[in-house]
Amino acid sequence: MSLKTPKGTTDLNPDDALVYEDLIDRTKNIFKLHGAVPIDTPVFELKSILLNKYGEDTKLIYDLKNNGGEECALRYDLTVPFSRYMSMNKLKKIKRYQIGKVYRRDQPSVVQGRWREFLQADFDIAGESLPMMADSELVCCMNRLLKTYNIGDFVIRVSDKRILYGIFEVCEIPNNLFATVSSSIDKLDKIAVNDINKELKLKGLTDKQIINLNIYIQKSGTVDVLDFLRENDVYKKCSEAVDDLCKLYEYCKIMKCSDHLIIDLSLARGLDYYTGMIIEGKYLNKNIGSVAGGGRYDNLIGSLENSSYTNTYNVPCAGFSIGLSRIFSCIQKPKVNTNVKVFISASGKLLLEERLKIQSILWEANISLETFYNKRNNPGEHKKYCVKHGIKYLIVVKEEQYNKGFVTVIEVNTNLENVIMIDNLPSHLQ
């Protein structure tokens, strides 16, 4: 039998797990800064709730074996479970965050940061609000997150699904091709436009439709794109959406989060439940695709199957997901790979009881520490261990010193030794 993890999954060693912990903490802090509260939902959901929500990606849902009970599937994202939670609890307003693993039966690619099991962090604003205020806060929150990870320069691309519908109408592309053509357009930042055009041709578009479509989907910028739309025939089809993006851009300027913002008409996120603004965050010069994405989904809660409140209960929502597994793959791993501050050793004898008493004193003072419970002590080896794992202090317990109420404390990086009274250890080490 071959011992390995399933394809598209990975273990985390202690070093990587500590980096993940720090990444999660930094993400939570930004969400809390924006006033979000945490929720949690099951890793698997009723299959009927997940179906028909993800467009062409529905095929990537992991079904669970039916053992004579409910038909279930692993969650594909955190948005649909959140909407189910809202509907079940008849909530009208919440600003929430959730961090958890999601599952997709995709073709994995470590280089491109694509896994079958990966960690996502979601931020959502549910409830009535002034037009584009919640959407603008999404941009602000995403902007702050991508800055705090300190990976490099990035862009936040926005558009609106209603503008896409307007473009398709002007280009005379039938509605039944919306999903498949949108999925091709969304690849424009990864694939050359000529290859996209060939793909569109294979999907049934005429040369005229492709030429007209290219006039729009190659437009990206800021106010210049909005001006272009206002002066174009498409404005009659989606004037509200264009005006909403104008508000979004102005609000983001006021909140000082427009420095990385781009209005990009090729943005066409494929999930069926988006109804308005769509958003995507991407680091430049990183071959991992987008690291964050989302948008407005005003009808998802009301559309859930088997909901007692369908057609009578609905809540407007906007939110985004950030792929922490992709972020992790870009982070420069720090040399310090432990959160332990102190190692307790002994010289000459085992001195187990003495070490345990010191251990108890330091734990009471909330000082993280480590000691070995084996049959031999070697302070020299323990110091090497401290250097390797980034532990700041080495305490060496010596019988004669201990009986007088003292121990030796070594600062590992400087080799500076101090004899410290045991009662003063917490204040010395903090």
Swiss-Prot record:
**Reactions mediated catalytically:** tRNA(His) + L-histidine + ATP = L-histidyl-tRNA(His) + AMP + diphosphate + H(+)
* Main localization of the protein described in the UniProt heading: cytoplasm
Tell me the superkingdom of the source. Eukaryota
Full protein name? Probable histidine--tRNA ligase, cytoplasmic
Q: Could you cite one Gene Ontology molecular function of this protein?
A: histidine-tRNA ligase activity
A GO BP entry? histidyl-tRNA aminoacylation
- Tell me which family the UniProt entry assigns to this protein: Belongs to the class-II aminoacyl-tRNA synthetase family.
The record's annotation in InterPro entries points to: aa-tRNA-synth_II/BPL/LPL, Anticodon-bd, Anticodon-bd_dom_sf, HisRS-like_core, HisRS/HisZ
Subcellular compartments: Cytoplasm
Q: Name one GO cellular component term.
A: mitochondrion
* Keywords, ordered alphabetically: Aminoacyl-tRNA synthetase, ATP-binding, Cytoplasm, Ligase, Nucleotide-binding, Protein biosynthesis
